[in-house]
């Protein structure tokens, strides 16, 4: 890896496509949903997760083993990409991988809010961003949310969280804090992003991700029951929505889907839009948005094969694989029917 000099997209994309071909598909998922946690762990041991399952097998078992192995493998895969990348390409990928810093911050905050144990929170952390082990340990050691805000002062999340904490204390829900984390992440992604040929499609993808994040946030707020205005939590940088229209769209999913279908995204989304129209719950709608974003990234990657978007597309696809396997393991441990679990997966 080098942060200076020229980029090397051809080399990195070739490596990433080889990794993409090793991701689980329909056949593997059909097998997994009919296995118990111990069988799932053994299945993973014969796949790309072999090293992690073997390394962790003496300390963990069942769903705990699966989750720790998934998160360690995810971090390794993305750190490998950074090791391969040079120059501007490295910078673009590193910025995007800060999404896992954002994920970890929100996971710790949610854990404190819900009263989860340190072990439960740690099992959900993904060490693929810029936070080092010392900072993550300090976050895990925090006994209350205000302490997390203090620990993060000096990071890209510090100022936004400090400003949002007072509102959180007033409303008693996590929306202000989580939105502050998301805003900080997307602001640093777009900050000083020079739209040359290498970054043009990358910016188009980021705009789509922000648009879908705004849609997701508005729906969550509308269904939270809290006295919150979606306009106050609008994230700048997208192209599809105006802040003032989100409140009305959030109460009418059909209009929201129509807005997406009639936009530039409609031409590049097919199955995902049908899933959005068929979604009958917030969870179902969010799952369909995940699938739509993945399909959009895939399409950009095919149209512009030497841009950064095939790499971002792989990052999303790998995340979905980890989410799917985790959902299967937790569902099987809870005794859910295989068909019910399969319906919850995001597969393209």
Curated annotation (Swiss-Prot):
Q: Does the keyword Transport apply?
A: yes
Keyword Cell membrane present in the record's keywords: the answer is: yes
A Pfam family: vATP-synt_AC39
Kindly state which keywords UniProt assigns to this record, in alphabetical order: ATP synthesis, Cell membrane, Hydrogen ion transport, Ion transport, Membrane, Transport
Taxonomy, superkingdom: Archaea
Q: Which Gene Ontology terms describe the biological processes this protein takes part in?
A: proton motive force-driven plasma membrane ATP synthesis
What stretches pass through the bilayer?
Answer: none
Q: Which family does this protein fall into?
A: Belongs to the V-ATPase V0D/AC39 subunit family.
**What does the function comment of this entry state?**
Component of the A-type ATP synthase that produces ATP from ADP in the presence of a proton gradient across the membrane.
Please identify the protein, giving its name as recorded: A-type ATP synthase subunit C
Q: What species is this protein from?
A: Haloferax volcanii (strain ATCC 29605 / DSM 3757 / JCM 8879 / NBRC 14742 / NCIMB 2012 / VKM B-1768 / DS2)
